[in-house]
Design a protein with these regions (language model features):
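Rossmann-like NAD(P)H-binding beta-loop-alpha module
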Residues: 387-400, 503-527
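Glycine-rich FAD pyrophosphate-binding loop
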Residues: 403-417, 527-538
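A conserved FAD-binding loop/helix module that cradles the flavin
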Residues: 518, 542-543, 609, 633-656
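Glycine/Thr-rich phosphate-binding loops of Rossmann-like dinucleotide-binding domains
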Residues: 32, 66, 174, 227, ...
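A Rossmann-like FAD-binding core segment of flavoenzymes
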Residues: 431-476, 484-504, 524-619
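Flavin-dependent oxidoreductase catalytic cores
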Residues: 1-385, 389-400, 404-405, 413
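Internal hydrophobic alpha-helix adjacent to the cofactor/substrate pocket in enzyme cavities
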Residues: 323, 328-329, 520-531, 643-656
Length: 656
């Protein structure tokens, strides 16, 4: 077997896990508002058990009434949720998976409005600007809170859980006691290391007492807080050793607090296993099993981690969202079939914070596992025009439902603009996602025709039953900007693909995600780069965690930023612009002297043009009298996030 270490069993306390693949706890907002788990929750976890994950950890579950961090958080502070939990554990056990459940009090990272009560922490220090200031927990209350963890663990056991995981990381309640950065107490729970760890010890004692050694007890900890004055990796080694002495059966090692959530969520550009060395240091300090987590997507790297003895199990967090059958495919050595997480954070982290059910750019089935993929009532001849990710998603889904599907691509490469999105620094993983879609289409039997431009006449002759227009978008060219048609101007897509020569000194026009990443791409190559944007900041549409690293690159390469600048004319060597922040300022400003001007103001639909306020879908309108069903998906409708494109493509294919 290729991954013999990853598929070997392991003992964690009284629990035997069949392999080393772990689903870590991830907020998903699938739970009901009353704190019970929904049927969607059952199907979601059950699907990952079918995919042969050995240990599945249920998301952070509230252990104290008045500590609910969000409207869709499951709760175990009373018996109300035991029955729904049993449905999840039964579904997972049926597939041979073990189930752990994370026990959490959000503490200072909570929300008083959602909780219906003041939030609490070791000390009355807000976790960040704009967050609620917590109440300092009284000495007597600390003992009461510890008992709450024990009672919740007992309920988890009654619900069929094989283990509980006490959340001691990421700045939540327990972590707020543990860290000298947030614990300023002078009672028996503050001051020296032993006192700051006392709350953790009390919790472990209560959980052990209530569960009587029948289930495993794990703790989730940080490898480092990544904060000045906080717990560093050296400190966390001592914490890990202390927790083992307290009787913990295993450790799940994550990283950082929310003020450094770029290391919690690890966006595109952060490599898989970015905290592996820190976890390895902790592993050296304990004799109990250690789970490592941190943007793992590929089994090869996980196998190496186990082989080297740097951890005992590997958690595939967002990868389990992207492809719930990752272990099964690894077992069968179908590695090209893996759908990799690209760490875009668009549907998982963004929705989690917004209180919406999570979804996934590369896996539109996420959150819809309960519905399944129904066979088509009648097989149709379906033409999908456009081989970007939306087109491939629609084609693959329609083919799986039993339709006769042909996918047309006008160029010699599949992937559309998403393929170009892989060119900027740190975005190379996107190619893996595109390749996985190509393989899916090929293996499903989609008829793929490259270098083929579809015409209305062709459709008249071929008589398909349905056409899905997934023709994507092209560079946005705003006609009111004088000189924008100048042939010397290089489009960002041409710059990325290397189809136009680029001079040393470059001005990028457009500071959204496309322009900002193009500027980063050029600066890394050694170009002297400036960027101009109408809004008051560069990259305001870039996911927060990714933008942090993007702006670090801007500083590293000395990229000059011109903001609040409404470009009025483009020249071969620069632009003129007005002050967009002050309409009363009629001054015309200029920046000149560049070797190349790159236009990266975003994209617009290929088959859309605007006449005043009216949007006309030219090709779609033309086809309505030719084809019984015409659908448009993704950027063909309007330029949007890839998340919206794949979701829309899946839904259209589902309803053919």
């Amino acid at each position: 077997m290729k991954f013999k270490n990853m598929f070997s069993p392991i003992q964690i306390g009284p629990m035997t896990v069949k392999n080393r693949f772990v689903v870590p706890p991830m907020g998903n907002n699938f739970a009901n508002s009353d704190g019970t788990w929904s049927d969607e929750s059952v199907a979601y976890y059950g699907e990952r058990a079918k995919g042969q994950f050995g240990l599945i950890t249920i998301e952070a579950t509230v252990v104290h009434k008045g500590a609910k961090g969000g409207p869709k958080k499951p709760c175990l502070y009373d018996d109300n949720s035991i029955e729904s939990l049993k449905k999840i554990t039964d579904a997972c056990h049926e597939e041979g998976a073990k189930v752990s459940i994370q026990l959490q009090n959000a503490g200072p990272e909570g929300n008083a409005k959602n909780a219906g009560a003041p939030i609490q922490a070791a000390t009355a220090i807000a976790s960040a600007d704009g967050r609620d200031i917590p109440e300092e927990v009284s000495t007597e209350k600390v003992y009461e809170l510890a008992k709450g963890y024990g009672e919740a663990a007992e309920r988890a056991m009654k619900g069929g859980a094989d283990a509980v995981e006490i959340h001691m990381a990421h700045g939540y309640l327990v972590n707020s006691f543990m860290s000298p950065r947030t614990n300023k107490r002078v009672d028996e729970f503050g001051g020296n290391f032993e006192n700051r760890m006392r709350f953790s010890r009390l919790i472990i004692e209560e959980v052990k007492k209530k569960t009587e050694g029948k289930i495993a007890v794990l703790a989730r900890i940080n490898s480092t807080e990544d904060m000045f004055g906080g717990l560093d990796n050296h400190d966390m080694c001592a914490v890990a050793s202390y927790l083992e002495d307290c009787g913990i059966d295993g450790l799940h090692v994550s990283r950082a607090v929310h003020l450094k959530d770029e290391y919690m969520w690890a966006p595109t550009g952060i490599h898989g296993g970015f905290s592996a060395e820190l976890v390895a240091n902790i592993k050296k300090c304990v004799s109990i099993p250690v789970i490592t987590v941190g943007r793992y997507t590929e089994p090869q790297f996980a196998e190496q981690i186990i082989k080297m003895g740097n951890a005992d199990l590997v958690a595939f967090g967002r990868q389990s969202l992207a492809d719930p059958h990752t272990p099964q495919k690894a077992m069968e050595e179908r590695l090209e079939d893996l759908t990799p997480c690209i760490a875009c954070l668009q549907g998982c982290v963004a929705n989690m914070y917004a209180g919406k059910p999570i979804c996934c750019l590369v896996n539109p089935v996420l959150g819809h596992e309960k519905e399944g993929l129904p066979k088509a009532e009648k097989a149709k001849k379906v033409y999908v025009i456009g081989g970007g990710v939306a087109g491939m998603c629609a084609a693959f889904t329609a083919k799986r439902r039993g339709h006769d599907v042909t996918l047309f691509e006008a160029t010699d490469k599949l992937g559309g603009n998403m393929r170009l999105a892989a060119y900027p620094p740190g975005k190379g993983d996107i190619t893996g996602m595109i390749r996985s879609y190509i393989v899916k289409c090929e293996k499903a039997g989609v008829n793929i025709k490259m270098n083929t431009k579809v015409t209305a006449q062709m459709l008249k002759e071929d008589t398909p039953d349905a056409v899905i227009l997934a023709t994507g978008a092209e560079t946005l060219v705003l006609p009111f900007i004088k000189g924008i048609e100048n042939p010397d101007i290089v489009y960002g897509v041409d710059c990325l693909e290397g189809t136009r020569p680029i001079g040393h000194k470059v001005l990028v026009v457009g500071g959204g995600m496309v322009g900002a990443e193009t500027a980063d791409f050029l600066a890394e190559q050694g170009h002297e780069v400036a960027i101009i944007e109408m809004r008051d900041a560069i990259g305001p549409d870039v996911i927060h965690e990714h933008r942090i690293f993007l702006m670090e690159a801007f500083e590293k390469y000395g990229i000059k930023q011109i903001t609040s600048a409404a470009v009025s004319e483009i020249f071969s060597d620069g632009v003129s612009y007005k002050n967009a922040a002050d309409k009363s300022d009629e001054t015309i400003y200029e920046v000149r002297g560049f070797d190349t001007v790159v236009l990266s103001m975003g994209f617009s639909s290929r088959y859309t043009h605007r006449d005043g306020q009216n949007v006309v879908y030219d090709f779609a309108e033309e086809l309505k009298d030719i084809v019984p069903e015409v659908h448009m998906v993704g950027d063909a409708v309007r330029a949007r996030r890839a998340l919206d494109a794949t979701k829309e493509a899946y839904e259209v294919a589902l309803n053919l």
